[in-house]
Amino acid sequence: MSLLTEVETYVLSIVPSGPLKAEIAQRLEDVFAGKNTDLEALMEWLKTRPILSPLTKGILGFVFTLTVPSERGLQRRRFVQNALNGNGDPNNMDRAVKLYRKLKREITFHGAKEIALSYSAGALASCMGLIYNRMGAVTTEVAFGLVCATCEQIADSQHRSHRQMVITTNPLIRHENRMVLASTTAKAMEQMAGSSEQAAEAMEVASQARQMVQAMRAIGTHPSSSAGLKSDLLENLQAYQKRMGVQMQRFK
C-alpha cells in the first residue's frame, strides 16, 4: 500500500458515511494526484462543510496544507488552528511538545506513527497544531504518520461506541437504528437508480420504504416490526443491479 493510499484510508475512516464522505474522498484523490492545486479554495470549501466535527476539519485542513503546494506567505486558517489546539489543555500542549521532540528525530512514516500511537488524541492534535502553525518542522512523511496515528485513535473510540450501540439489548434503540439504516439504504438506492428505464422500480421500492419508516415513526410501532427492513431493501437493490448487468457483492 502506498503512503498516500494509507493516509487516505485513515483520514476517511473518521469521516461519517454519506454523500459528503464520497465528496471528500474525491477531493483527497485529486489532491494526492496533484490535480487540485488551489489551497485557498480548498480550505474555503472545507470550512463550510456541514456535519464534520471541528477536529475532523482540522485534520483534513492539515493534510491539504501538507500536500498542496502553496505560496510561503499564505495565511494559516483559524478554523484549523482552533481545532488543533488540544482543547486549550496545557497538559495536551506539554505532551505535544515532548512528542514533537521525538518526531523531529524520526524520518519514516511508520516510525512516526508507532511513536505517536502511545499518546492521546488531544496531545496528537496539539502536536499537529504546532507543525501547522510553523512552530515546528518535520518531514512530510513524519507528519503523515502523526495524522494516521490521530485518525486511528479517533476511529478506535468511534468503533467502541458503534459496537456498544450494535450489541445493545435495548429494543427501542435497536428498533430506531434499524429504521435509520433502512432509510439511509433507501436514499442510496434512489441515488444509484439514476435515470434509466429500469430505475422506476428501484425508485418505487425505495420511496415506499421511506414512507413506511415515516409511518412507523408517526404512529409508534412494536420494536420488532423493523426487523429485516434493511435486508429486504438490499435484496431489492441487488435484484435491480442484476437486471442492469452489474454484479456486486452484497452491501453489509
Curated annotation (Swiss-Prot):
<comment type="function">
    <text>Determines the virion's shape: spherical or filamentous. Clinical isolates of influenza are characterized by the presence of significant proportion of filamentous virions, whereas after multiple passage on eggs or cell culture, virions have only spherical morphology. Filamentous virions are thought to be important to infect neighboring cells, and spherical virions more suited to spread through aerosol between hosts organisms.</text>
</comment>
<feature type="region of interest" description="RNP-binding">
    <location>
        <begin position="165"/>
        <end position="252"/>
    </location>
</feature>
<dbReference type="InterPro" id="IPR015423">
    <property type="entry name" value="Flu_matrix_M1_N_sub1"/>
</dbReference>
<feature type="region of interest" description="Membrane-binding">
    <location>
        <begin position="1"/>
        <end position="164"/>
    </location>
</feature>
<dbReference type="GO" id="GO:0016020">
    <property type="term" value="C:membrane"/>
</dbReference>
<keyword id="KW-1048">Host nucleus</keyword>
<dbReference type="Pfam" id="PF08289">
    <property type="entry name" value="Flu_M1_C"/>
</dbReference>
<comment type="similarity">
    <text>Belongs to the influenza viruses Matrix protein M1 family.</text>
</comment>
<dbReference type="GO" id="GO:0042025">
    <property type="term" value="C:host cell nucleus"/>
</dbReference>
<dbReference type="InterPro" id="IPR001561">
    <property type="entry name" value="Flu_matrix_M1_N"/>
</dbReference>
<keyword id="KW-0946">Virion</keyword>
<dbReference type="GO" id="GO:0003723">
    <property type="term" value="F:RNA binding"/>
</dbReference>
<dbReference type="GO" id="GO:0046761">
    <property type="term" value="P:viral budding from plasma membrane"/>
</dbReference>
<feature type="short sequence motif" description="Nuclear localization signal">
    <location>
        <begin position="101"/>
        <end position="105"/>
    </location>
</feature>
<dbReference type="GO" id="GO:0039660">
    <property type="term" value="F:structural constituent of virion"/>
</dbReference>
<comment type="function">
    <text>Plays critical roles in virus replication, from virus entry and uncoating to assembly and budding of the virus particle. M1 binding to ribonucleocapsids (RNPs) in nucleus seems to inhibit viral transcription. Interaction of viral NEP with M1-RNP is thought to promote nuclear export of the complex, which is targeted to the virion assembly site at the apical plasma membrane in polarized epithelial cells. Interactions with NA and HA may bring M1, a non-raft-associated protein, into lipid rafts. Forms a continuous shell on the inner side of the lipid bilayer in virion, where it binds the RNP.</text>
</comment>
<dbReference type="InterPro" id="IPR013188">
    <property type="entry name" value="Flu_matrix_M1_C"/>
</dbReference>
<keyword id="KW-0472">Membrane</keyword>
<keyword id="KW-0694">RNA-binding</keyword>
<dbReference type="InterPro" id="IPR037533">
    <property type="entry name" value="INFV_M1"/>
</dbReference>
<comment type="subunit">
    <text>Homodimer and homomultimer. Interacts with NEP. Binds ribonucleocapsid by both interacting with genomic RNA and NP protein. May interact with HA and NA. Cannot bind NP without genomic RNA.</text>
</comment>
<dbReference type="Pfam" id="PF00598">
    <property type="entry name" value="Flu_M1"/>
</dbReference>
<dbReference type="InterPro" id="IPR036039">
    <property type="entry name" value="Flu_matrix_M1"/>
</dbReference>
<dbReference type="GO" id="GO:0055036">
    <property type="term" value="C:virion membrane"/>
</dbReference>
<keyword id="KW-0468">Viral matrix protein</keyword>
<dbReference type="InterPro" id="IPR015799">
    <property type="entry name" value="Flu_matrix_M1_N_sub2"/>
</dbReference>
<protein>
    <recommendedName>
        <fullName>Matrix protein 1</fullName>
    </recommendedName>
</protein>
